[in-house]
UniProtKB/Swiss-Prot annotation:
GO terms for biological process: rRNA processing; tRNA 5'-leader removal. InterPro entries: RNase_P/MRP_Rpp29-subunit (IPR016848), RNase_P/MRP_Rpp29_sf (IPR036980), Rof/RNase_P-like (IPR023534), Rpp29/RNP1 (IPR002730). It comes from the Eukaryota. This is Ribonuclease P protein subunit p29. Pfam families: RNase_P-MRP_p29 (PF01868). GO terms for cellular component: multimeric ribonuclease P complex; nucleolus; ribonuclease MRP complex; ribonuclease P complex. SUPFAM superfamilies: Rof/RNase P subunit-like. One of its GO terms (molecular function) is ribonuclease P activity. It comes from Bos taurus. Component of ribonuclease P, a ribonucleoprotein complex that generates mature tRNA molecules by cleaving their 5'-ends. Disulfide bonds: none annotated. It is found in: Nucleus, Nucleolus.
């Protein structure tokens, strides 16, 4: 294939194309002159070394490996978590005594949050802190409700969603109490805080940035 592509012009072709044959000496002289012009700082000996080599690499480019984009693993959606029942508390785990240590941790968390609960601590300050605090582990009681069966229910808060509290009672019964139309109390070290569920329909993570009014309607 190479012999077909590269071959010398015949005399007839050279005449028609006006191409003159250059001898080996003229070709060598041309290469030497070209190298000298291209690399003027190189010595004659170095040029001779270049000419003695079989091949001269003019340029070389390394092929950059394309970095594979790592796909970020997406977490489960809320719908998928519900379908997998990840939030469900198993019946064998629905025991009040099992969550008493959680309640003790919650009390210490609130004491640290309020810089210590002292008798002279302002109740308004505690109320403001509790409204934005994480209530998981608190003992919550229903004091008022439009549904009489909810009144008097007391237990440790295990789960909080936007619209309900899930609490475990001393009788080891898991109760789901809607926030709407209910008033709750939270007690710690003698301080009692009231939570109006109708105004408390927020997720636990959203309450930390919520500005609650000091005074508002208390209708169920």
């Amino acid at each position: 294939m190479t012999s077909v592509v590269y071959h010398a012009f015949s005399q007839k072709e050279a005449k028609e194309l006006d191409v003159q044959h250059s001898g080996a000496q003229r070709a060598e002289a041309f290469v030497r002159a070209f190298l000298k012009r291209s690399m003027p700082r190189m010595s004659q000996q170095a040029l001779e070394d270049h000419l003695q080599r079989k091949a001269v690499v003019l340029e070389y480019f390394t092929h950059r490996k394309q970095k594979e984009k790592r796909k970020k693993s997406k977490g489960l959606s809320a719908k998928q978590r519900r379908e997998l029942r990840l939030f469900d508390i198993k019946p064998e785990q629905q025991r009040y005594s099992l969550f008493l240590p959680l309640h003790e941790l919650w009390k210490q968390y609130i004491r640290d949050l309020c810089n210590g609960l002292k008798p002279d601590t302002q109740p308004q300050m505690i109320q403001a802190k509790l409204l934005k605090a994480d209530l998981h582990g608190a003992i919550v009681s229903v004091t008022k409700s439009k549904c009489p069966s909810y009144v008097g229910v007391t237990g440790i808060l295990l789960q909080e969603t936007k619209h309900v509290f899930k609490i475990i009672t001393k009788e080891d019964r898991l109760k789901v109490i809607p926030k709407l139309n209910c008033v709750f109390t939270v007690e710690i070290d003698g301080f009692i805080s009231y939570i109006y569920g109708s105004k408390f329909q927020l997720r636990s993570s959203e309450r930390s940035a919520k500005k609650f009014k000091a005074k508002g309607t208390i209708d169920l």
